[in-house]
Amino acid sequence: MAFKDNAVELEERLVAINRVTKVVKGGRRLRFAALVVVGDRNGRVGFGTGKAQEVPEAIRKAVEDAKKNLIEVPMVGTTIPHEVLSEFGGAKVLLKPAVEGSGVAAGGAVRAVIELAGVADVTSKSLGSNTPINIVRATVEGLKQLKRAEEVAALRGISVSDLA
């Protein structure tokens, strides 16, 4: 679900900068890789990566990439509709809904994605690999898996009150 309108102001957050080298005949070629998360704090979030010889250029490319990959996050009040466990590579991320007022209990890369998505109350646990890019990808994958009660009821062909 990519959104093309740039009318909404998106907030950007730099998650990681990595210095990468390529060994060539004449020595080492140095470049920088940036990982950026963007979101409107109102249910839309995306991430992007960029690589360049200078840090600011890598960040600019990452922001451009992130704006092309926005997803819609279903929410129930200030939290997520249900618990979800998602994997990407060696990283696993568990997201659990939390009661209103409990805040975002998440670390590092997961916190950036959750906060910019606009989710105010959630508990999370990162398992396995802690590589920022894989953690961000696993978190976004988890947010994509979320479904509202109405969607689940429609898929099952029953009313929302019959779900419980």
UniProtKB/Swiss-Prot annotation:
Coiled coil: none annotated. GO terms for biological process: translation. Keywords: Ribonucleoprotein, Ribosomal protein, RNA-binding, rRNA-binding. InterPro entries: Ribosomal_Su5_D2-typ_SF, Ribosomal_uS5, Ribosomal_uS5_bac-type, Ribosomal_uS5_C, Ribosomal_uS5_N, Ribosomal_uS5_N_CS, Ribsml_uS5_D2-typ_fold_subgr. Residues 10-73 form the S5 DRBM domain. Transmembrane segments: none annotated. One of its GO terms (cellular component) is small ribosomal subunit. Pfam families: Ribosomal_S5 (PF00333), Ribosomal_S5_C (PF03719). One of its GO terms (molecular function) is structural constituent of ribosome. SUPFAM superfamilies: dsRNA-binding domain-like, Ribosomal protein S5 domain 2-like. It comes from the Bacteria. Belongs to the universal ribosomal protein uS5 family. The N-terminal domain interacts with the head of the 30S subunit; the C-terminal domain interacts with the body and contacts protein S4. The interaction surface between S4 and S5 is involved in control of translational fidelity. HAMAP family: Ribosomal_uS5_B (MF_01307_B). With S4 and S12 plays an important role in translational accuracy. PANTHER family: MITOCHONDRIAL RIBOSOMAL PROTEIN S5. Part of the 30S ribosomal subunit. Contacts proteins S4 and S8. This is Small ribosomal subunit protein uS5. It comes from Streptococcus sanguinis (strain SK36). The lineage of its organism: Bacteria, Bacillati, Bacillota, Bacilli, Lactobacillales. The gene is rpsE.
